[in-house]
Amino acid sequence: MGILGLSKLIADICPQAIKESDIKNYFGRKVAIDASMCLYQFLIAVRAEGAQLTNVDGETTSHLMGMFYRTIRLLENGIKPVYVFDGKPPISKSGELAKRAERREDAQKALEKATEAGNEADMDKFNRRLVKVTKEHANEAKELLKLMGVPYVEAPCEAEAQCAALVKAGKVYATATEDMDALTFGSGILLRHLTFSEARKMPVKEFSYAKVLDGFGLTSQEFIDLCILLGCDYCDGIRGIGPKRATELMNSYKDIETILEKIDRKKYTVPEDWNYQIARELFVNPEVADPSSLELKWFDPDEDGLVRFFCGDRQFNEDRVRSGAKKILKCKSSQTQGRLDSFFKVIPAACGTTPKRKADDKNNVQQKKSKTAGNTKGKRPK
């Protein structure tokens, strides 16, 4: 879920914090990508006749095809991707996970009815709702990335939190995910739609964390409280308080504790045993691996290894796999030039440097004039 309604709220309150961009504008950038979100996209998008792609044994291969070709597209655009995988979810997320399980059960029942009725549109819709990224999907993706020479990070907990930590440490430029809580975790830049297929023709949406805080007039701590009021993965919001009202309350009272003192409890229903303080702590001090201990390196692809991985039981076309491996190698060699702004830095002039230079120039001119004047003796004027 991320943060309920945050994207629209930012667009309404501070549209200057969002800009649309083309994927090619991130040439030379290192980007931390929410791997689970990507795998989910690939599982629901890479389909043949309404079903996921599988091998002869019925094992799903959609996620691998998506990961392979979408990563190549990123590399071809000069982006250096770092995939970040989820670890164990925090206990506070159990409520949200239970809701997701319940929604899948409802989708399963709806799918059965749609199948009986022969309603293909509904069958496809509910099939998508049943998609879940498994541990096996993640492990296969890690094996593939290793063969492609692309680094990945296993987060101890939430992938978005780890991505944000990498951004804050300067290890990467941005977080790429569809979940808005990357901003709540403090990612300086959030990129949405970066891993969407080219066929969808959707521009990359770039969110600036600094501009979001400035636009809302909130500190990072206050912004976290706003996100909790909106509703997050760790706890529900307060019934009756929508995005606009939540923003007004935060601007007036600055924290949830004061809001709870001031609001009319008869008008607004506060959840029983509301664990907003736990949610706040998870955003302020998330469990992440120390970015300084993570070495992010991109290697040459293992072409033969990729062929063995794809062309055995998974039955991919060998020529296409080898072609993909060669594209990765070509991208790696072209990326060595990097971005121009990584080579040149603007160094501010020391105080007083410019006036001194002008004074020196003036003195030099005077000296030259003196010398010239001395040399004109005995010369015929022109």
UniProtKB/Swiss-Prot annotation:
Its cofactor is Mg(2+). PROSITE patterns: XPG_1, XPG_2. Mg(2+) 2 binds at D179, D181, D233. DNA binds at R47, R70, E158, G231, D233. Residues 96-115 have a biased composition (Basic and acidic residues). Residues 364-375 have a biased composition (Polar residues). Disulfide bonds: none annotated. Residues 336-344 are annotated as: Interaction with PCNA. It is found in: Nucleus, Nucleolus; Nucleus, Nucleoplasm; Mitochondrion. Binds 2 magnesium ions per subunit. They probably participate in the reaction catalyzed by the enzyme. May bind an additional third magnesium ion after substrate binding. Its EC number is 3.1.-.-. Keywords: DNA damage, DNA repair, DNA replication, Endonuclease, Exonuclease, Hydrolase, Magnesium, Metal-binding, Mitochondrion, Nuclease, Nucleus, Phosphoprotein. Structure-specific nuclease with 5'-flap endonuclease and 5'-3' exonuclease activities involved in DNA replication and repair. During DNA replication, cleaves the 5'-overhanging flap structure that is generated by displacement synthesis when DNA polymerase encounters the 5'-end of a downstream Okazaki fragment. It enters the flap from the 5'-end and then tracks to cleave the flap base, leaving a nick for ligation. Also involved in the long patch base excision repair (LP-BER) pathway, by cleaving within the apurinic/apyrimidinic (AP) site-terminated flap. This is Flap endonuclease 1. It comes from Glossina morsitans morsitans (Savannah tsetse fly). The lineage of its organism: Eukaryota, Metazoa, Ecdysozoa, Arthropoda, Hexapoda.
